Amino acid sequence: GLKVGLWGGTDFTGDYKEFDYYLSYTIAGFTVAVWDIYNYSPGLPYSKDIFNYNKFSTSHFLDLSVAYNFDTKFEVPLRLYWATIFAGRDLNLEGRNRYSTYVNAEYSVYRDEHWIVDVGLGGTFAFNRGDGDGGANFYGYDGIDQISLRATYKLKLGRFDMPVFAHAMWNPDQRQGYLQVGVNLFAF
């Protein structure tokens, strides 16, 4: 089905801020989505003007993704995901779009009526690196940049489902780790 949504996030210090809009369509396990991601990341150009889409000064990038959930048809708890930045602040040194790309595979290692535990592996590359970019893409450098473990609890409050999750991610490229905690408050 068709989904239109908003997503936002920050870190505990307020150094990272994000506010996104998306449109997605899912049918028979396939999902196609377009995301408008507006964020502030230290070390990157930042515009406080949320309506600024000039590629040289914007804080936006537009992302096109496709995904397939093998569980839908084949009952295999594997999900594959591909996303490429097609517009915005993903520029090589010559000022052209790099088309930075993120690919990911996730597999559910445990499921019951209340819990889902997933492991994942993701990597990045760019289709249009500039001559002096040295293998750089929007996310860092080409290679593995996400090893993850996510636990989701299917919280039920009355007749409402509100999945709660904790997602630990390690980035070998940047030698950092992240913890994301969230709840899906509503979906329609």
Show where each model-derived region lies:
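Transmembrane beta-strand segments that form the barrel wall of outer-membrane beta-barrel proteins
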Residues: 1-12, 32-40, 49, 76-90, ...
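Outer-membrane beta-barrel "beta-signal"
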Residues: 149-151, 155, 175-188
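Detector for outer-membrane/organellar transmembrane beta-barrel domains
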Residues: 51-134, 186
